[in-house]
Every structure is written in C-alpha cells, then in structure tokens.
Amino acid sequence: MANKPLTGFSVYSFILNLAAYGTIPMVSLYMKKGLCAPDNVIVLISSVALGGMLTGSFFSGGLIQRYGVKLILLAVHITYALANIALFLLGKGCMPDTWLYITIGAVLFAYSFMYACSDIASTCEMMLLATPGNKMVAMSFYNGFNHCGRGMSRMLTSLILGSGALAAHWTLGGIEFSHYQTLFLTYAICVCFAASLLVVVPAIFPEGDYHYDALHTGK
C-alpha cells in the first residue's frame, strides 16, 4: 500500500488488539473458574466493564482534545500493562473476597475506559492519515487489521487454554498462581512489546508530510 504511515499504524493496531483484547472476557472466566465467584458477581463485573466503555466513550473526545492522541495512546499502554499485572497478582486469598471483587471491578473499569479512549484516538489518527478522497478505503483497510487483531486475540487464548499448554497451578515465592493468571501476565508482556511499535505511529513520532494539529499533539 502506498500510504506507508497508515499501513504502519494499522499493523500497530493489529498487534495492540492482539495483545489486549483477550483480557476482558478472560476476567469473567477467571472469576468463575479460578475464584469461584457467585454468578451475580460475575454478571455485575461484566456490567462494570460495559460501564467503563460507555464512560470512556463519553469522555474520550474531551480528553483527546485536551491531551492529544500521543498522550492518550501512551496512557492506554500504561493502563493495559498495569491492569494485567494487577489481575495477575489478584489471586484467591490475597484479600477478603468482597474486596477482591471490588478491586477487580475497579481494574476492569479502568481497562474498559481506556479501551474506549484507544478506539476513539485510533480512529482520529486513522482519519488524519487517510489521503483525501480515499478515506473509505483507508477505513476499510484499518478496520480489517483492527478486527483481525481482536479476533485472533480471543482465538489464540482459546487455543492456549484448550491445548493445556499452561500449567494449571504453579508457585512463586510461596504464592500460588493459576493458568488464568499466567495469561494475564502474558497479556502484560505482549502489551509492552506492542509499545515498541509506537515508533511507527505518526502521532508519537511525526514524519513526512503529516502535520499534527492540537487534536493530535495536545498543544
């Protein structure tokens, strides 16, 4: 494709979604199978995730206008990594169950909030990179990579769980972890790897003929 900045950004979005999109459904599975949480709590936590996305969608426009796409994307990576590390550490018995569920809910709300912000910020970046008169093709191209990353994230998670490749339980420093927690740690590592691809995002490192206004720089 002739539009190299858009191609690079689309590949970055694919990798980021591949690393990050499995976390939210994995939380529900972890709570049911790993923490043996009551059904009503699991449904409530899933509602909290939806609330985070709705809240993020509502506030993301103002946040992007104030801070710019660059800072929002950096905040997304930091939040994704810290949230997955927190979920990795939040095991059975680390605190009373009620507080454990509240903490997981808060982490998931923050994660979902930033996921919505990431979607809006990425769309802004994609529309800026699209050449005039070719925005529909650019949108299709970008969305193809975007949704492919999301689908493959859940597919790979399913294959890993189904294959039994991960130890069901393991210990570190006297603390026991499950294979669900191992996946959260894996997600965190993959998000950090995806951060290395920020070098191809023009909002982070502008180059060529793409000049960023206040919406993208936050200035």
Per-region residue spans from a language model:
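Short amphipathic helix-loop junctions that connect adjacent transmembrane helices
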Residues: 25-42, 162
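Hydrophobic core of transmembrane alpha-helices in multi-pass small-molecule transporters
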Residues: 97-118
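Cytoplasmic membrane-interface "Motif A"-like loop-to-helix N-cap segments
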Residues: 65-80
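C-terminal ends and interior cores of transmembrane alpha-helices
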Residues: 78-98
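Helix-to-loop junctions at the C-terminal end of transmembrane segments
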Residues: 56-69, 161
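Transmembrane alpha-helix termini and helix-breaking/packing motifs in multi-pass membrane transporters
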Residues: 152-176
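Pair of pore-lining "gating" transmembrane helices in MFS-fold secondary transporters
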Residues: 2-27, 109
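Intracellular juxtamembrane helix-capping segments at the cytosolic ends
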Residues: 117-131
